[in-house]
């Protein structure tokens, strides 16, 4: 009996192409969504794995650093133990050497103290003898000195009195000579003036008398001639011959009188010339006196000028001495400051030497100064090289600074050690940088981070691929097997 509730199955109607296409599209969308979901799951898985790797890399880095520090501590501890053993052995050896040196020095010191005490006693004895001898000698010398001083004092006083008396006599004599010369000059000048005045008056009176005499004589002659002329004129009428004779006679006489007048005129001219010469002499004497007075005034002016120059020189010398005193004071202050700086620098050097002595090695404490690296032949050649260039002053200066040779040895040694340590430091820094770079590369190879992924790393492989640049493909392209990540993810999940 068939059940009433069930309906018979109807055959499926065939789907159209549109329905098939729609179903295919839905299937494709479902496949795409499943693929996207798988891709999201794969991405999330990779991110989780990357975070886990970063966490593990950080833990591994801490473990490596811890183990590396432990290893370094152990190595450093072993090295320090070895250094301490070496230093302890060196210290014991140096202590033994120092003990032997101290014992020998103590023995030498006791011997030196005994020798010093013996030498001091002998020296004090000799000094006492020399002091007594010197006191006697000083007493004799003092007595001789006092005697010679008295003799020299007496001689000096007598000679001084003689010189003072002689000086006073010469001063009086010079004053008398000066007064006498001045009086003689005044007297001679007065006599010359009187003589000149008397000669002038005599010549003047004589000239006046001659003029008066000639005038009278000429007047008489003229009157006589006039009278004769009148007589001749009277007699002219009497006889012409007598008048001619009288005229000739008068003519001759007139010529004689004219000659006499001419001679008298020449005499007058000579007298005038003599008067002019005397006037010239008077003028010359007056000029000479004025010139002498001018010379005296010039000498006086020169003396005043020299006096002013001496005063100026004295002022300049006083100013120069004051400037020199100020300059000397400034230079002395500068010298004291420079010496103070030198002393401070020396104290600083000594303090630094005390501080540096703590860091000296045992070898430096035992042998602080290295020996010369030159052979004896090279040292002789260095001494004989250019001996003419070394003067006596330079040799003295070199001898004064010979004690600084050991200081410069230590200074140069420290300088060389500093340069060596600087060079070694640069080498160690280079090695450290290389080791750091290698360690960084190693840590970058075992860790994953954005910074690591942004750089080239041959150890980083994603999907069996490195981030290094690919080499150009060969001419024949090989065939690769392609495996989808979905299959890998399904196997991993």
From Swiss-Prot:
Localization (cell): Cytoplasm, Cytoskeleton, Flagellum basal body; Cell projection, Cilium, Flagellum; Cytoplasm, Cytoskeleton, Flagellum axoneme
Keywords: Cell projection, Cilium, Coiled coil, Cytoplasm, Cytoskeleton, Flagellum
Main location: cytoplasm
UniProt feature coiled coil, ranges: 99-163, 253-280
Domain of life from the UniProt record: Eukaryota
GO CC term (a single one): axonemal dynein complex
Single GO BP term: regulation of cilium movement
InterPro entries according to UniProt: DRC1/2_N (IPR039505), DRC1/DRC2 (IPR039750)
Summary of subunit composition and partner proteins: Component of the nexin-dynein regulatory complex (N-DRC). Interacts with DRC1.
Task of the protein: Component of the nexin-dynein regulatory complex (N-DRC), a key regulator of ciliary/flagellar motility which maintains the alignment and integrity of the distal axoneme and regulates microtubule sliding in motile axonemes. Plays a critical role in the assembly of N-DRC and also stabilizes the assembly of multiple inner dynein arms and radial spokes. Coassembles with DRC1 to form a central scaffold needed for assembly of the N-DRC and its attachment to the outer doublet microtubules.
Family: Belongs to the DRC2 family.
UniProt-recorded name of the protein: Dynein regulatory complex subunit 2
Primary gene name: Ccdc65
